[in-house]
Amino acid sequence: MLELFDVSYEELQTTRSEELYKLRKKTFSDRLGWEVICSQGMESDEFDGPGTRYILGICEGQLVCSVRFTSLDRPNMITHTFQHCFSDVTLPAYGTESSRFFVDKARARALLGEHYPISQVLFLAMVNWAQNNAYGNIYTIVSRAMLKILTRSGWQIKVIKEAFLTEKERIYLLTLPAGQDDKQQLGGDVVSRTGCPPVAVTTWPLTLPV
């Protein structure tokens, strides 16, 4: 089974923080070459703290994917890290930002198979989580490569603003809608590609057969 559920920062510290931070270092520093702060083989930053929540995707006891959520009324990447890019964007008082989205490709292939739509499942989990927490959409900053992945998913994302980190490197502030249409579209795709029961994609947390 593939289980996706959310935990608080405090819960993470007593369970899988070391595993998560090591996989984030492997993804964002080693594979993608991002300029992130790493220590003792792990990556974490100032937004990993009380009030932050994390979706964890677990298969056979191993973490295969994750994404982090920070409330917009707290320091976040939009208003702090990339404030110089998006200071002219007005954000709602009540909302959430997602960041540190990743899939460990090697683990996913080994545990789920070459063609399992793990990114699509994690997108669906984000929608179900948002609905469960009364968020109509999710704000996020992505690279051009991630923008292409999201666009191909069929999720009806919206680009709020494009910004240039360097002369060649662009980033995008997006809204990811979390309505019933989005749930049905992403969930229907997961059902068609995995053969799981339709009811399995409607819940939060998610438990999917593999």
From Swiss-Prot:
Domain of life according to the entry: Bacteria
GO molecular function: N-acyl homoserine lactone synthase activity
Keywords carried by this UniProt record: Autoinducer synthesis, Quorum sensing, S-adenosyl-L-methionine, Transferase, Virulence
Annotated SUPFAM superfamilies: Acyl-CoA N-acyltransferases (Nat)
Transmembrane segments: none
EC id: 2.3.1.184
GO biological process, one term: quorum sensing
InterPro entries documented for this protein: Acyl_CoA_acyltransferase, Autoind_synth_CS, Autoind_synthase
Listed Pfam families: Autoind_synth
Keyword Transferase: yes
Xref: Gene3D superfamilies: 3.40.630.30
Catalysis performed (reactions): a fatty acyl-[ACP] + S-adenosyl-L-methionine = an N-acyl-L-homoserine lactone + S-methyl-5'-thioadenosine + holo-[ACP] + H(+)
Functional summary from the UniProt entry: Required for the synthesis of OHHL (N-(3-oxohexanoyl)-L-homoserine lactone), an autoinducer molecule which binds to EsaR. OHHL is necessary for biosynthesis of EPS virulence factor (extracellular heteropolysaccharide) which plays a role in the development of Stewart's wilt on sweet corn.
Family according to the record: Belongs to the autoinducer synthase family.
Record's protein name: Acyl-homoserine-lactone synthase
Organism: Pantoea stewartii subsp. stewartii (Erwinia stewartii)
